[in-house]
Amino acid sequence: MKIRLSITIILLSYTVATVAGQQCGRQGGGRTCPGNICCSQYGYCGTTADYCSPTNNCQSNCWGSGPSGPGESASNVRATYHFYNPAQNNWDLRAVSAYCSTWDADKPYAWRSKYGWTAFCGPAGPRGQASCGKCLRVKNTRTNAAVTVRIVDQCSNGGLDLDVAMFNQIDTDGFGYQQGHLIVDYQFVDCGNELIGQPDSRNMLVSAIDRV
């Protein structure tokens, strides 16, 4: 009985060590860890905070990153800008080294170009791989100008890092440019991906701006 128990413990230890040593995420070709185990920022599977915490840039199956449908939102969030220039880069996620390119670079052109791009690290909603491809409605709290964007990258400012064109669309009074950032509200919204592939989908607006 003791021998059998010892063998079982050894096998379990070997299994845990094997899982922890597996590569995942962008380092592992987009693979996720078995058994919903977390994938760390360095591409290894594990179950501690080093692997699972969003603040440690966990890539997938992270703590607090369950499914997030339309509706999750946050207010008074910092939004900076980044020069993705997707149109000039043929809407190629790999060309701009976007984090989400591991999973989304081969999506149809109509999917990649339907909305302007943003990096996301806001206080509400999924992080890492779980956020990739999701859409946000972003509103400038100062002017109420709003735009819909798609998450293609990570950031570290605690909010959003909008493509400069999207930033400028909602910076209607120029105050954001003057101070280097905007204060925005955001809400996860349905991307309407079921429309992709229909006739004229490539002619759809890249983004919509309005005043609420």
Curated annotation (Swiss-Prot):
SMART domains linked to this entry: ChtBD1 (SM00270)
Signal peptide annotation: 1-21
Family matches, as Gene3D superfamilies: Endochitinase-like, RlpA-like domain
GO cellular component annotations of the record: secretory vesicle; vacuole
PROSITE patterns: BARWIN_1 (PS00771), BARWIN_2 (PS00772), BARWIN_3 (PS51174), CHIT_BIND_I_1 (PS00026), CHIT_BIND_I_2 (PS50941)
Keywords: Antimicrobial, Chitin-binding, Disulfide bond, Fungicide, Hydrolase, Nuclease, Pathogenesis-related protein, Plant defense, Signal, Vacuole
Domain notes: The C-terminal vacuolar sorting signal (VSS) (194-212) is required for vacuolar localization.
Job description of the protein: Fungal growth inhibitors. Neither CB-HEL nor CD-HEL have chitinase activity, but both have antimicrobial activities. CD-HEL has RNase, but no DNase activity.
Designated name of the protein: Hevein-like preproprotein
Organism, scientific name: Arabidopsis thaliana
Lineage of origin: Eukaryota, Viridiplantae, Streptophyta, Embryophyta, Tracheophyta
